[in-house]
């Protein structure tokens, strides 16, 4: 029982006393679970002031620009760790020992192959389908091939499903790309890292060996780390909502992918690149900056600012450094990249952007990196989904471990009152 209480006074001087819960970090939370029995609900469209669950996985302080995974700062993880170690931390809550990490990595590596019949499913899609449409369908279909681990009440089944999803996502993501460009699928290699294996499956062909560039490999690994989890966002909440009904893990992750596909969520880096294409040249930047400052103009700079972070996005700091490393390594000369770098310079120095805290965010830099690597913008959200899969799994598993209720939001009904029905049709 919480020590602190909150009181709500309703019409007629009826007072409801509610517990105030305290977390390890962050805001206090008023426990409103008893409100329904009192005949009232809360109204919070978008759940911006509602804690839908209790979680020990990720903490965000948007005002201070803090992002912690199991208590570890994101910048330390991105700099001193690798994606699979971060996956272990998210899934199990603690840093792995060397022995635990080696076993974890081996298990993931040995499950990267997908059932051969799944490769045939790709051919049911049009070649010009958006890769996210294909990714949604293929992920949901996994339940038809791996139905020996679908008992969500069995911890071992949940762990097996977690390994399968984490292992097979890069394979399926790369196959989405290969299918879209008409090239043969490239199978995974056990001698490569998680990020290196993905790059090899993306760019290798039967004609020549693809040598994984270590700078690009590290950049991809960092992209995966920085997108691994972000607390109760739209797609994670979707996974939890789907999971609350007892749905199988593959269906839940497919639901998360569908939510992530939205341009307001996972499509932000793709939208940022399209904005750069619209600007097209450095000489056009002043005009677009002027429009961005005009509140009556519909144009908005994509990839700047963040709904949660009122300060600098902590992920963007690492991503900016990585972006410049990649551009230096590749020596790329590209009009859009020049536009991006000039926009970055303006945003970091223009008083308007500084005052509004419209700093370049992780989507801005990740889009530039992926483009420089030769990855088309249609694949950006697929890579985001691949990275976020471990976060979705961690939340899905936590929900089952801690106990859950089926999600059933309420509504503020503003439709017709009860009325009689008399058909106007001739009978």
Swiss-Prot record:
GO terms for molecular function: citrate (Si)-synthase activity. Allosterically inhibited by NADH. Its EC number is 2.3.3.16. InterPro entries: Citrate_synth-like_lrg_a-sub (IPR016142), Citrate_synth-like_sm_a-sub (IPR016143), Citrate_synthase (IPR002020), Citrate_synthase_AS (IPR019810), Citrate_synthase_bac-typ (IPR024176), Citrate_synthase_sf (IPR036969), Citrate_synthase_typ-I (IPR010953). It catalyses: oxaloacetate + acetyl-CoA + H2O = citrate + CoA + H(+). It comes from the Bacteria. NCBIfam families: cit_synth_I (TIGR01798), PRK05614.1 (NF004126). Belongs to the citrate synthase family. Citrate synthase is found in nearly all cells capable of oxidative metabolism. This is Citrate synthase. It comes from Salmonella typhimurium (strain LT2 / SGSC1412 / ATCC 700720).
């Amino acid at each position: 029982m919480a020590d602190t209480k909150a009181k709500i006074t309703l019409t007629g001087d009826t007072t409801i006393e509610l517990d105030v819960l305290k977390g390890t970090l962050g805001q206090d939370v008023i426990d409103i679970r008893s409100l329904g029995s009192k005949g009232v609900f809360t109204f919070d469209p978008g759940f911006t002031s509602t804690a839908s669950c209790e979680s020990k996985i990720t903490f965000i302080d948007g005002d201070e620009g803090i992002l912690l995974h199991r208590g570890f700062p994101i910048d330390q993880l991105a700099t001193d760790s690798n994606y699979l170690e971060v996956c272990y931390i998210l899934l199990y809550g603690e840093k792995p020992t060397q022995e635990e990490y080696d076993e974890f990595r081996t298990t993931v590596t040995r499950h990267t192959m997908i059932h051969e019949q799944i490769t045939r499913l790709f051919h049911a899609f049009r070649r010009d389908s958006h890769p996210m449409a294909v990714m949604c369908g293929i992920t949901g279909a996994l339940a038809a091939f791996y139905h020996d681990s679908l008992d969500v009440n069995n911890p071992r089944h949940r762990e097996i499903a977690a390994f399968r999803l984490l292992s097979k996502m890069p394979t399926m993501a790369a196959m989405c790309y290969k299918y879209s460009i008409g090239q043969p699928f490239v199978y995974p290699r056990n001698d490569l890292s998680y990020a290196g294996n993905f790059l090899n499956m993306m760019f290798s062909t039967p004609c020549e060996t693809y040598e994984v560039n270590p700078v690009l490999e590290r950049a991809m690994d960092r992209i995966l780390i920085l997108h691994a989890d972000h607390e109760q966002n739209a797609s994670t909440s979707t996974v939890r909502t789907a999971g609350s009904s007892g749905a199988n893990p593959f269906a839940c992750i497919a639901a998360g992918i569908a939510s992530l596909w939205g341009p307001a969520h996972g499509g932000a880096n793709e939208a940022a690149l399209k904005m750069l294409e619209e600007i097209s040249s450095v000489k056009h930047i002043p005009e677009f900056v002027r429009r961005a400052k005009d509140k009556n103009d519909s144009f908005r700079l994509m990839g700047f600012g963040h709904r949660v972070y009122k300060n600098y996005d902590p992920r963007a700091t690492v991503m900016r450094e990585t972006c410049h490393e990649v551009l230096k390594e590749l020596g790329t000369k590209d009009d859009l990249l020049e536009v991006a770098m000039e926009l970055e310079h303006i945003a970091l120095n223009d008083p308007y952007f500084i005052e509004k805290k419209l700093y370049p965010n992780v989507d801005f830099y990740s889009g530039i990196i992926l483009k420089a690597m030769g990855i088309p913008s249609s694949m950006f959200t697929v890579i985001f989904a691949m990275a976020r899969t471990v976060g979705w799994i961690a939340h899905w598993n936590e929900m089952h471990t801690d106990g859950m209720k089926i999600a059933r939001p309420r509504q503020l009904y503003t439709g017709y009152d009860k009325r009689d029905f008399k058909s106007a049709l001739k009978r």
